[in-house]
């Protein structure tokens, strides 16, 4: 158990600011769950913005949108480097990268997920055929197995993981809700310290063990956000009859 954990009944913190206190610092690497705006730790990201920590390297599928999610940290210039898969939804992300103001390490989406999973499992590196012969493979070791070419990808680990779940018990056992699970479990396992933002906290034993998606051994701190905004990333409506 990480040194910041205080026991099963003491993982809950009063708010996101308190949950981050003594854990986040300048220059750290963070793994942040979410896919677009789905399953992002909204309150923790906002508290991180208010903390004014800077020089961060952030591992996340994307960087939210302008003014919401991780986009807030781009606007305040708290992020030095992104390790991610998708840029297009955030204009400030795109602008900073093209202007040379933000370092960016592109990853195919599946490769990013596997690098996080490997980091959590203690696997230092793995071979994948994805990206061979493209700019993704530049500067990386390649090998041929059974007539097929592969790229060596290294595992990802983070100083702190910030994740979002639907329900937790007081020991930190988590249940995710549908597609909001996405990168969250992998981020949690890859983080040396993991802080989970949840919509409901119940007593130990209230969650059927067979329904636990992520065991509490991976969770160091919990914070309740019972009414997240859950902003819709792309609203699409049916065209009316002409």
From Swiss-Prot:
Pfam families: CoA_trans. The keyword Transferase applies. Keywords: Lipopolysaccharide biosynthesis, Transferase. Pathway: Bacterial outer membrane biogenesis; lipopolysaccharide biosynthesis. The keyword Metal-binding does not apply. Coiled coil: none annotated. GO terms for biological process: lipopolysaccharide biosynthetic process. Its EC number is 2.8.3.5. One of its GO terms (molecular function) is succinyl-CoA:3-oxo-acid CoA-transferase activity. It catalyses: a 3-oxo acid + succinyl-CoA = a 3-oxoacyl-CoA + succinate. CoA binds at residues 33-39. Transmembrane segments: none annotated. Heterodimer of a subunit A and a subunit B. Belongs to the 3-oxoacid CoA-transferase subunit A family. This is Succinyl-CoA:3-ketoacid coenzyme A transferase subunit A. It comes from Xanthomonas campestris pv. campestris (strain ATCC 33913 / DSM 3586 / NCPPB 528 / LMG 568 / P 25).
């Amino acid at each position: 158990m990480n040194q910041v954990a205080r026991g099963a009944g003491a993982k809950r913190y009063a708010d996101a600011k308190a949950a981050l206190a003594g854990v986040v610092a300048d220059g750290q690497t963070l793994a942040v769950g979410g896919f677009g705006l789905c399953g992002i730790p909204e309150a923790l990201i906002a508290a991180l913005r208010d903390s004014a920590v800077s020089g961060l390297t952030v591992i996340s599928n994307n960087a939210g949108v302008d003014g919401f999610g991780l986009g807030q940290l781009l606007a305040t210039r708290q992020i030095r480097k992104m390790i991610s898969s998708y840029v297009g939804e955030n204009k400030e992300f795109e602008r900073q990268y093209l202007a040379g103001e933000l370092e960016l390490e592109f990853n195919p989406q599946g490769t990013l997920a596997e690098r996080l999973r490997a980091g959590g499992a203690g696997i230092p590196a793995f071979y994948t055929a994805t990206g061979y012969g493209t700019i993704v493979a530049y500067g990386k070791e390649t090998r041929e197995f059974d007539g097929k070419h592969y790229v060596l990808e290294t595992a990802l680990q983070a100083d702190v993981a910030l994740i979002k779940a639907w329900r937790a018990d007081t020991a930190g056992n988590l249940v995710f809700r549908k597609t909001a699970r996405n990168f969250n479990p992998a981020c949690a396992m890859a983080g040396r310290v993991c802080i989970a933002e949840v919509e409901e906290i119940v007593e130990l034993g209230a969650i059927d063990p067979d329904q636990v998606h992520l065991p509490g051994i991976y969770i160091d701190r919990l914070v309740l956000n019972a009414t997240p905004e859950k902003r819709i990333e792309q609203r699409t409506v049916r065209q009316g009859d002409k």
